[in-house]
């Protein structure tokens, strides 16, 4: 099926052109608009347990929406909540996706939870990650712009700036020169990738943005005013 990326890189959206027999699955709440000829069905992809793992561990919604155009053709437009870009991948091999990055895909793409272990729990990667496998179109959403990095040897990325990476890469979450420099420098944990493959990074960091917003939140005492 054909697609268009609109509003990139600041406020990205994907417009998918469906014909009879095409199906695209998307995060709950991602639909911006669609033609009258397009139909939407909501389901728990992979059953209750897999949906629960994908939601709790991967930061994605419990339900997925599937869009079809059974009576001909139609368009559906999909976008995420945060400002940023949309990355299209023609999936040819498994990719690991960080928490909250999945936007949509062909139904031929299998997206399931992949536990990150203690490395994932104590890092900006989140408690778990998602693994996309199979073949077809995959759409990821970022916070900020997207940069593609070809790794041949080693490459280090702040965990909050990781969007996705090829599953063939080995990785290890660690500090930058020990805990003291990490605490004093204001830098978080980093992910050291090893091998050959592609890493996709995002130019903004969601945890850092949340920390920046925190002083502007209304305090509980404001409720009494």
What is each residue range found by the language model?
Residues 1-225:
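Composition-driven recognition of glycine/serine/threonine/acidic- and proline-rich low-complexity segments
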């Amino acid at each position: 099926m054909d697609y268009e990326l609109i509003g990139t890189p600041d406020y990205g959206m994907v417009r998918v052109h469906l014909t009879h027999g095409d199906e695209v699955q998307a995060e709950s709440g991602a639909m911006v608009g669609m033609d009258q000829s397009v139909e939407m069905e909501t389901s728990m992809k992979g059953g209750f347990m897999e949906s629960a793992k994908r939601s709790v561990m991967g930061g994605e919604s419990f339900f997925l929406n599937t869009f079809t155009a059974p009576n001909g053709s139609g368009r559906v437009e999909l976008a995420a909540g945060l400002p940023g870009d949309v990355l299209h991948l023609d999936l040819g091999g498994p990719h690991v996706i960080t928490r909250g990055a999945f936007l949509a895909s062909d139904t031929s793409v299998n997206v399931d939870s992949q536990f990150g272990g203690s490395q994932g729990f104590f890092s900006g990667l989140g408690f778990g990650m998602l693994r996309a496998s199979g073949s077809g179109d995959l759409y990821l959403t970022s916070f900020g712009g997207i940069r593609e990095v070809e790794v041949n040897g080693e490459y280090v990325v702040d965990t909050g700036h990781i969007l996705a990476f090829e599953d063939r890469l080995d990785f290890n979450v660690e500090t930058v020169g020990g805990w003291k420099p990490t605490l004093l420098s204001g830098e978080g944990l980093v992910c050291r990738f090893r091998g050959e493959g592609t890493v996709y990074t995002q130019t903004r960091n969601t945890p850092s943005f949340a920390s920046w917003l925190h002083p502007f939140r209304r305090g509980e005492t404001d409720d009494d005013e």
